[in-house]
Amino acid sequence: MDLLQFLAAFSVLLWPGTEVTGALKSTLDPSLKIYKKMFEVKRREQLLALKNLAQLNDIHQQYKILDVMLKGLFKVLEDSRTVLIAADVLPDGPVPQDEKLKDAFSHVVENTAFFGDVVLRFPKIVHHYFDHNSNWNLLIRWGISFCNQTGVFDQGPHSPILSLMAQELGITEKDSDFRNPFKTDQTEFIPSTDPFQKALREEEKRRKKEERRKEIRKGPRISRSQSEL
C-alpha cells in the first residue's frame, strides 16, 4: 500500500460512519449502549490501520503518514469541541440526537481514543510533535476529560487507553508500575545517536526546506525593469 492509499484510509478513520450516528436512539439513554457497540466496530478498524502502519518498517513513510494524520485529527477534534461547547453538550448527559452534535460527539470520542493508540504505538514520533505544541496539549487534555465523563470507556477492553495515554504524554503523573505496553525501549532519554531520532531530524529538515521553497515561490516577483529603478 502506497502513501496516498494509507492517507486515504486514515482520513476515513477520523470521521464516524453514518451507520453509527443513524442507529442511536434515546430512552433513558440506551443510545449509549448502542453507541458503545458501534464504537467497538470503529476501534477494530482503527487498530487494524495502525497495525498495517507499524508493519511498514519505514520510518520516513511512517513519519509522513503520521504528520498528515495527526494534523487532521487535531483539526477535527478542535472543530468538534467548538460545536459541542457552543451547544452546551455535557459529556455525562445522554448521547446527543441532533445529527450535527452526534457527529461532533463521535469525532471527539473516536479521535481521542485513536490518538491514544498512536501515542502508545509510536511514542517517539508523537512526542516529537506533541511536546512542543501547546494547542494540541490543551485539546487532548479537554478530550480526555470529556471522554472520561461519557461512560463510553467504562469497563471493557478500551477502558485503560485514556489513563495510559495521559501518563505517556505526562498529562498525569505516572503510576509507580506504569509501563507502555507497546514500548520496547523503556529508557527515559533517547540518545542523540539513535537511528530513529536521526531519521526524524532528517525528515524534519527536508520538510522545512520544502516549506521554505514553497514560500519563496509564493513571494512577490519583481520584474527586471522594476529592479533597475
From Swiss-Prot:
Compartment(s) where it occurs, according to its Swiss-Prot or TrEMBL record: Endoplasmic reticulum lumen; Secreted; Cytoplasm; Nucleus
Molecular function GO labels: protein-macromolecule adaptor activity
Spans annotated as Disordered: 182-229
Signal peptide region: 1-22
Gene Ontology BP term (one): regulation of protein glycosylation
Coiled-coil regions listed: 196-218
Glycosylation sites: 148
One protein family per Pfam: ERK-JNK_inhib
Classification via InterPro entries: Coiled-coil_dom_con_pro_134 (IPR026321)
Motif (Prevents secretion from ER): 226-229
Keyword check for Nucleus: yes
One Gene Ontology cellular component annotation held by this UniProt entry: extracellular region
Post-translational modification: O-glycosylated, with additional sialic acid modifications.
Superkingdom, natural source: Eukaryota
Subunit structure: Interacts with TADA2A. Associates with the PCAF complex via TADA2A binding.
Function, in words: Molecular adapter required to prevent protein hyperglycosylation of HSP90B1: during translation, associates with nascent HSP90B1 and the STT3A catalytic component of the OST-A complex and tethers them to a specialized translocon that forms a microenvironment for HSP90B1 folding. In the CCDC134-containing translocon, STT3A associates with the SRT pseudosubstrate motif of HSP90B1, preventing access to facultative glycosylation sites until folding is completed, preventing hyperglycosylation and subsequent degradation of HSP90B1.
Family affiliation: Belongs to the CCDC134 family.
PANTHER family in the record: COILED-COIL DOMAIN-CONTAINING PROTEIN 134
Protein name: Coiled-coil domain-containing protein 134
Biological source species: Mus musculus (Mouse)
Gene coding for it: Ccdc134
